[in-house]
Amino acid sequence: MRTEAALQLGFCALCVMLALLGEGMGRELPDPPAVNCVWSRWAPWSSCDPCTNTRRRSRGVEVFGQFAGIACQGSVGDREYCITNAKCNLPPPRECSDSEFQCESGSCIKLRLKCNGDYDCEDGSDEDCEPLRKTCPPTVLDTNEQGRTAGYGINILGADPRMNPFNNDFFNGRCDKVRNPNTLQLDRLPWNIGVLNYQTLVEETASREIYEDSYSLLREMLKEMSIKVDAGLSFKFKSTEPSMSNNSLKLDASLEYEKKTMIKDVSELTNIKNKSFMRVKGRLQLSTYRMRSHQLQVADEFVAHVKSLPLEYEKGIYYAFLEDYGTHYTKNGKSGGEYELVYVLNQDTIKAKNLTERKIQECLKIGIEAEFATTSVQDGKAHAKLNKCDDVTTKSQGDVEGKAVVDNVMTSVKGGSLESAVTMRAKLNKEGVMDIATYQNWARTIASAPALINSEPEPIYMLIPTDIPGANSRIANLKQATADYVAEYNVCKCRPCHNGGTLALLDGKCICMCSNLFEGLGCQNFKGDKARVPAARPAVTQEGNWSCWSSWSNCQGQKRSRTRYCNTEGVLGAECRGEIRSEEYC
């Protein structure tokens, strides 16, 4: 630690000296010393749980990796097998009433649901008989993909949950139907869905501006992804806690087409020269749904995992639960597909061809119109571009670096088949633009593989059945775990950036997103200093970074408080905007 402090002080002194003496001399400041991930020590092992023969321990992140240092990629929790002489005292299973049937799993269903042709017990034990009568006529199909995946979870830090908490194969003896306009057949609605409406909406937008540097683009993308919590631009796209289930990890080849992968690629474009960026986003909405407000049917495995959570709070296992099911579930959602294209443009070619921003935007959009009078997603129309866009879209000159306007296209696709996403990328790589036929091929596959494209979140602890033993303790623990999870992976554990750079945390690594006037891992260098005729250095307010909040004080006079401090390490004269102290009623 002494060596690191000395390096920081030396770097600070060097920054001041060069800033005062070297302005306009083309001197380039070195990047700040690398900061490696620092974990806290492991807490002592818990006692051995006699019901699972498992003991657990946890640790925390103290400092995230930064300035090309090692990122924090490990897990907070740890567990191992153990042996104990203590007895497992599980509460007795719930006794079903005379009007109920007990499934082999121990759950209870209404007796009228027995032998109706539906698996109202997830284990199918209610159908060990000849169906007396089927709930739905044979013309009605099973539930569609929108119904099967309804309610899928959301992680407020960005990771995709590994499991769905709902049992959407439960119908409660009802035969609610909806006509699917894509198949023209009737689909059956699960009990958990209160309303499902099919409504085709198509939209396509191009960024209002061409981004001059990758940081401006990245900053905009991250702000769009962030959910409004007190976490700043903090993201954790990779789940790092071991799953509570052996069957939760589903490796999907389409992951390479996720927006998270695109964000990672953009964040690594720090040294690219003479390039600018433009975004084109498209969305095809097929349906909207609303979950029931009460009596939601959760999966047996979800209940089993809730029951296995220790009554005494231990953050590692609770984090694992949140990464399995999400910090929230989807109360209301929209299903369909969306794509995002980031065009890497060659500035030299744009200037040589005298192209305007407006022309580039119009030519790189697909040009989709929606025929809302029809019910098919295949009836899109394309604006005729004729040959006026050849100087923008053609890649026939792309064999030689720098001749084409479009150097590269980064693709993010959500919804639809993997094959259609591959075709889309191949078309973009070959011609630099996507046409209406490629779009239609992708759109046709969305009905069979829809994605959640918009959601209204509700805390996951709201799904815990209140009739299970220890429900209130586990609900309180999950509330604390959600707050701790956001605080654990937070930019407050990063060091500040120079010259007004914006801090972001991506998968255990802090990055400084510089304004278009500055560069370097810490935004320490003014680009104008390297020009043949040095530009005047602008006046910049140096900003520190708030530390993490302290723990809440004890409740006194119906109030409690917490504090934080302004971290200015490595940035002289920096200040923080905001309050040092906060209070709330208790």
UniProtKB/Swiss-Prot annotation:
Ranges of residues in domain MACPF: 132-493
SS bond list: C37-C72, C48-C82, C51-C88, C96-C108, C103-C121, C115-C129, C136-C175, C363-C389, C494-C510, C497-C512, C514-C523
GO terms, biological process: cell killing; complement activation, alternative pathway; complement activation, classical pathway; killing of cells of another organism; protein homooligomerization
Any Pfam family hit: MACPF
Predominant localisation class: secreted
SMART domains according to UniProt: LDLa, MACPF, TSP1
Spans through the membrane: 229-236, 357-364, 365-373
Residue span(s) of domain EGF-like: 494-524
Domain TSP type-1: start-end pairs: 36-89, 543-585
Membrane topology annotation: Multi-pass membrane protein
GO CC terms: extracellular space; membrane attack complex; other organism cell membrane; plasma membrane
Domain (LDL-receptor class A) ranges: 94-131
Record keywords: Complement alternate pathway, Complement pathway, Cytolysis, Disulfide bond, EGF-like domain, Glycoprotein, Immunity, Innate immunity, Membrane, Membrane attack complex, Repeat, Secreted, Signal, Target cell membrane, Target membrane, Transmembrane, Transmembrane beta strand
PROSITE patterns: EGF_1 (PS00022), LDLRA_1 (PS01209), LDLRA_2 (PS50068), MACPF_1 (PS00279), MACPF_2 (PS51412), TSP1 (PS50092)
Signal peptide: 1-26
UniProt subcellular location: Secreted; Target cell membrane
Residues carrying covalently attached carbohydrate according to the record: N246, N274, N354, N545
Annotated function: Pore-forming component of the membrane attack complex (MAC), a multiprotein complex activated by the complement cascade, which inserts into a target cell membrane and forms a pore, leading to target cell membrane rupture and cell lysis. The MAC is initiated by proteolytic cleavage of C5 into complement C5b in response to the classical, alternative, lectin and GZMK complement pathways. The complement pathways consist in a cascade of proteins that leads to phagocytosis and breakdown of pathogens and signaling that strengthens the adaptive immune system.
PANTHER family: COMPLEMENT COMPONENT C6, COMPLEMENT COMPONENT C9
Subunit structure: Homooligomer; about 20 C9 chains oligomerize to give rise to a huge beta-barrel that forms a 100 Angstrom diameter pore in target membranes. Component of the membrane attack complex (MAC), composed of complement C5b, C6, C7, C8A, C8B, C8G and multiple copies of the pore-forming subunit C9.
Similarity comment: family membership: Belongs to the complement C6/C7/C8/C9 family.
Name this protein carries in UniProt: Complement component C9
UniProt source species: Takifugu rubripes
Gene name in the database record: c9
